[in-house]
């Protein structure tokens, strides 16, 4: 969690492993969720900077629907203000927001059980950023490894104050609705530690108001982009969920492989080939070693055909549902308006508690 950073990213081949059990399954936390799902509130989300892709699908989106269906209160944030943390303008914001809504609904996010909202529609959330900034030091923000990585890949010529304070804004996202469970990839865990620090320090200074959110670490395998680097919405190296079957075939055909014609699953020695094998295995819910063995000496061309067929078959029902929702954008946008109303009510109640706890703000 992001809540708000891309939820499925890759940092290298060593992270790729065979398909695992559902995120966090078998842990004490997962057992508590199963026993009493109604006691948990999840805050998660995606920045509207481009279409969601296969990395998001396997890395976080399926888990959101799973948690919703268990009975967890799932709140999905579209952090439109945070688009400008690492770029100077928010391009195509309305288009990308509509796209996220279509993806969420087509994937199974149910507006009757889950909430979707935007930053810009919830003033109380953003106001919480001010007292929260007093609870962390500049040195602590500078040391955050996720911020360092984002700064390194920023599109801006200079680091903005919004970029540096990004983890605190994320704390406001989570704590505005009293979120107590945040699904994150391992590369996002430092952000959640800032949220926990803010909650703990506020409670110590002003009295107990906030829960310290628990981390639900994703164990979902990580997929490389088609160029063999970190998969990203902004790097043109992903396969969007909304792509057509032909577009998917073209993107996968251009994926980086290697010169060895014999296909094997070896993430450390053959990261690019292994990522394609893994993607096939995830789509088919099979073991990647078996998938690789079946392709054998077929080479990269056979591998890419297999991947393309698996992806298009897996996403066909999603794409059909998405196309139906796209025919009624009035309804789709009404889902966001209703979510904004609920998020406003939650954030305003939290802000009232913060003001009361701080005493001087009446």
List the predicted regions and their residue ranges.
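Classical nucleotidyltransferase
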Residues: 127-130, 143-206, 210-225, 233, ...
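Conserved nucleotide- and phosphate/pyrophosphate-binding catalytic cores
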Residues: 190, 196-362
């Amino acid at each position: 969690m992001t809540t708000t950073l891309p939820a499925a990213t890759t940092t290298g081949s060593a992270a790729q492993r065979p398909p695992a059990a559902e995120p966090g399954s078998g842990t004490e936390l997962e057992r508590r969720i199963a026993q009493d799902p109604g006691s948990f509130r999840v805050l998660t989300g995606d920045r509207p900077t481009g279409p969601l892709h296969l990395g998001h699908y396997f890395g976080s989106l399926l888990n959101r629907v799973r948690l919703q269906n268990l009975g967890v209160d799932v709140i999905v944030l579209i952090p439109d203000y945070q688009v400008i943390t690492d770029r100077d303008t928010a391009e195509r914001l309305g288009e990308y927001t509509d796209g996220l809504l279509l993806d969420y609904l087509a994937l199974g996010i149910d507006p009757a059980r889950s909430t979707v909202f935007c930053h810009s529609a919830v003033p109380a959330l953003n106001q919480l950023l001010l007292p929260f900034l007093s609870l962390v030091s500049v040195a602590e923000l500078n040391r955050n490894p996720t911020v360092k990585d984002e700064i390194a890949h920023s599109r801006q010529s200079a680091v903005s104050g919004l970029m540096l304070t990004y983890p605190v804004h994320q704390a406001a996202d989570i704590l505005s609705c009293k979120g107590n469970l945040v699904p994150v990839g391992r590369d996002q865990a430092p952000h959640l530690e800032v949220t926990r620090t803010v909650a703990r320090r506020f409670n110590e200074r002003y009295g107990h108001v906030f829960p310290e959110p628990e981390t639900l670490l994703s164990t979902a395998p990580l997929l490389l982009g088609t160029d063999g680097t970190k998969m990203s919405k902004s790097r043109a190296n992903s396969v969007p969920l909304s792509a057509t079957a032909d577009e998917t075939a073209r993107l996968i055909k251009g994926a980086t492989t290697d010169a060895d014609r014999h296909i094997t699953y070896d993430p450390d020695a053959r990261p690019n080939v292994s990522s394609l094998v893994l993607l096939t295995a995830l789509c088919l819910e099979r073991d990647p070693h078996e998938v690789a063995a079946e392709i054998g000496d077929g080479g990269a061309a056979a591998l890419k055909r297999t991947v393309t067929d698996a992806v298009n078959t897996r996403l066909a029902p999603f794409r059909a549902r998405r196309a139906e929702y796209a025919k009624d954008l009035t309804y789709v946008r009404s889902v966001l308006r209703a979510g904004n109303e609920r998020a406003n009510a939650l954030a305003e109640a939290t802000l009232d508690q913060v003001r009361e706890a701080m005493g001087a703000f009446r």
